[in-house]
Amino acid sequence: MQEFAKFGIFWCGRWPASEDIDIDSGFGEGIGLNPAPAPALTLTLTLIKMRRKKIYQILAAAAGVFAMAALLCGSALAQTTKVKGRVTDESGIGLPFVAVYFLNTTIGVSTDLDGNYSMETRDSTASLLCASILGYENQIIRISRGAYNEVNFRLKEVNTSLTAAVVKPDNRYMKWILKQIDNHRETNDPERRSHYVCDTYTKMELDLTNAEEQIRNKMLRRNFGFVFDYMDTSSVSGKPYLPVMISETRAKRYHGISPEVNKEVIEATRISGLNEDNAVSQFTGSMHLKTNFYNNFINAFNVQIPSPLSASGNIYYNYYLVDSLNVEGRKTWKIRFHPAKGISSSVFDGEMNIDAQDFGLREIHVKLFRGANINWIRDLVIDRSDQRVGDSVWFYKQDRLYVDFSVTMRDSSKLASFLGNRQIEYMNPILGQEAKPQVNKVNTSVHIEKEAARRDDEWWDNARPYALSTKEQNIYNMVDSIKHVPLYNNIYNVVNTVVSGYLETKYFAFGPYSRIYSFNKIEGNRVQIGGRTTPGVSRKFRLSGFLAYGFKDKKFKGGGSLEWMLSRQPTMKLTFSGKKDMMQLGKGTSAFNETSLLTSILTKRGSEKRSLVNEYATRFDWEIKPWLNTSTALEFRRIYSNVFVPMRRVVSEKDTAFVNSVGSNDMHITARFSKDETVTRGIFEKSYLHSDYPIVTIDLLGSLKGIGKNEYSYFRSEVSMDYKLKLPPVGASRIKLTAGKIVGTVPYPMLKLHEGNGTYILDQSSFSCMEFYEFASDTWMSLFWEHNFGGFFLGKIPLIKKLHWREVVTLKAVYGTLSERNNGILGSEHSSEAPLLFPKGMTSLNKPYVEMGVGISNILRLLRVDAFWRLTHRKIEGADGVMRKSPNCFVATIGLELRF
């Protein structure tokens, strides 16, 4: 018996009305369904002789991206109608490309390769749902309006005698279309326009799934039982969810190429449960999580996913021209794309509509292909539509995203997951208009107007392009009610303590708790208490301090600081600080280098070489421009000798003298240059997250000899470049180049002490096979290079592929020289000229130091294990003067990585 596959069109987004159908598109008869005209939903019938089971058992695409999506236009009291289900034949096999649409509307979708579909609408007339595909009888089912409906169709095959057709692949026309899309990229991409101004409305929503399972406890139900009145159901996953956050933002967006402008002025914003002065508002506009498919790659949570419109799209996708439509009087191609065979990187699966005259993107619907090597994301859907402005210009119309965040990729009714939704509406575009002068003067890429969080309900009613549904309006009331439940505040405090490291009260926060207890060979057991004031005391000033005691050295240590936030946006902060504490000189910048119980446990034996440091500083941080951040500081520092890091100087050919301490009086200036960098702004902190461009830092330090003993005058300069180079599909590289020089005569604690790692914890800012105080220079240059392949190779191995491991290679190198006046190597010809003799084992770099490593990251989505080999300086001089193999020729490290 011959089995045949019936193909239709996989359509997501706007369903063509009868007047939009291209009569010459080649459809056969028998597709229509009276009284409604037949939608253009089937490809010219292609009958392929093969077993149905082999065709229909292809896996469906689905994975995730964080988004905050909204619904379509409707009245203030309109409710959203949601439908989800599956279309099968009489034997239960899923049918792909079946048109599922609401009768007498332009709303419809197509089933995926497993026969699944989902959609939602605010259209109050949508009550009859139809499933239609050539070769089967149409089926109509009435659904409940304004509610969630799960509707499964079981289509009956039409008994029609048809002759099998022989199909030969010919993708020359498809390649020509893709080439034309690439040729017209400059004119169709809105971001390549010289200037434009537009209004945006962004709505985000965060939902919690399986809420009933999480609140089974009687006490929880007694306190939070009322929230179940606000439950809803997702049309994508079919899961019931509890809305926990909603935000709305109305903004004006400015874009320009020459002069370069990329700014957003937020005119109004409100977030359920948050006050008007919150740090989250800066991320609620349209500037973040951009989905411009004209770019070669879409950056989703720092994962580069090839765009179906990419010039090299044929490497990642197989394309199928499935239809030609007449949309708004213009011929439009419908193109399906599926991941190419053998692709191990993250890719999309979906469909797009391309204008046949301008080769511009009209609509696109994508899902992240299931099995993609992305953590914490189970489902992802991106929908984007563009509109014609004027006669020949394409511009944004709507951008919708959906994501299911979960700790497991499996469906489970017991584990909670979060659904993120975002929808952006673009309105009133004006092309060719430059930004106003006052906008160009704004020092930040996202500017929040002072009255943005104080807009009333009447203002919002007029500002929205469509009204909120009743359920959406109730989210604000529900979140406010939850905040008044005492148990909620207790749970919030526990979670906040774990995340921030501080136990907060209304006016004071105790911590960080990770430093309460630690131990080292100088202090022995060490206990520390500390804390800082909270914004409940002041949002302009913050006091912090700590007190520590070592039971072995029997000494108290301590410190404190006063921060004065002059301006949060742009940043202007003045800080006064002082402390006396044990510090490790020559360490990297990793947070794991700070004193804690974990670093104490994982410290290599004999690697601790801490020094007591007494320092006072006044520092001024100033964000002059978004691309230029500066820091100016006056620092007074004194470093003390101890038995592990002794300070001695040569007084004669046969004698040395003990030096108690050395000091410096520094003027420190740092300038940091970056472009289009994403930052977070807290009340007192500013953190740098990401930039697609190199970040250059210039560090200048001048020191003058004062009235204290053993002080020195010198000048130190250092320039560094940090760049994350994206190389999809083979991952991304992190490159850091540094060069510096010290002019003057200085003791060894003030030289460039090349960064060692005294622990088994991965520190990407230090040399894993190098000890503290092993090498020093006064002229140096270094290279840190790390490449993460993102599973490019391991993803091709069947059994390992499911583990989602990611391969990493690392190269670290440094070369430096030491002038005679600073060469304090014991026994060297010029050691008597140096201010201090070097500690035993410390020397200069007489040749480049190189180490390399290989590792596997994303183990259990948390851990990373690396193995490093020391390629040079493998022999070191022992205490008896004999050269021996370094004990650090091979080192294994472990680290934590939380990445998507």
Residue ranges and their predicted role:
Residues 81-95:
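Structural motif
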Residues 93-96, 118-126:
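Short Pro-Gly-centered beta-turn/loop motif in secreted/extracellular proteins
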Residues 102-104, 130-141:
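A short, solvent-exposed loop/turn motif at the edges and junctions
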Residues 143-169:
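Extracellular beta-sheet/turn segments enriched in Thr/Pro/Gly and aliphatic residues
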